[in-house]
Design a protein with these regions (language model features):
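Juxtamembrane regions of bacterial inner-membrane/periplasmic proteins
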Residues: 1-199
Length: 199
């Protein structure tokens, strides 16, 4: 009974957070460049359109490593889980937080379709900082870093933005330019291999 009440509480939180659009610069899924979507999925979540919001094998691996090998609770986050974490949860790394993240991801995918979730992620993911203003979403990041529209980005520029998803501070374009360059090259390499297979 308590668990059902808790699930209802989480469902209400999700509805309140995702049932309306808060960004004036948000693009529809159809407006997002397909190359960028493919690049993002290849690097961040290759099974996005197959899993129910949670990659159970990865979750089990991370929990096992945490319990038996004292490793930090890192990885195993699908795009859906990342969206939950970025929108509703704090940066705390605990087993309880990971379980809550997974539960909310399952509920979110039950309530909204995959394209909605992916598009919300693309429009809101944190990609940098300008003073006190955070740069959220690929549209805003494109304007900030390249002063152009998202549709006009080159593959190299898309790869840079996708590289930043992993950590805009760690891969800061000015302070850690070499680190970002290596990450960008990895993103491009993964994408180009995919393109060869498709062709």
């Amino acid at each position: 009974m308590i668990f059902v009440v808790y699930l209802n509480h989480l469902s209400q939180l999700l509805y309140d957070a995702f049932s309306y659009n808060t960004s004036t610069n948000a693009l529809s899924f159809e407006q997002q460049p397909k190359s960028m979507i493919n690049m993002l999925l290849l690097v961040e979540d290759q099974s996005f359109f197959k899993h129910p919001g949670v990659d159970f094998k990865e979750i089990i691996r991370v929990v096992r490593d945490y319990i038996f090998y004292d490793k930090p609770l890192r990885g195993a986050s699908t795009i859906t889980m990342q969206l939950i974490k970025n929108t509703l949860l704090n940066r705390e790394r605990s087993l309880g937080r990971k379980v809550k993240e997974a539960l909310m991801a399952l509920l979110l995918e039950h309530s909204f379709d995959k394209k909605f979730i992916l598009n919300r992620y693309i429009n809101t993911v944190y990609l940098g900082q300008k003073g006190n203003i955070s740069i959220n979403g690929f549209t805003n990041a494109t304007r900030f870093y390249f002063n152009k529209k998202l549709a006009l980005l080159s593959l190299e520029e898309m790869a840079m933005l996708v590289a930043l998803v992993k950590g805009p501070d760690y891969y800061h374009p000015v302070r850690h330019s070499l680190r970002l360059l290596k990450r960008k090259q990895l993103v491009l390499s993964i994408y180009q291999k995919f393109e060869k297979i498709v062709k």
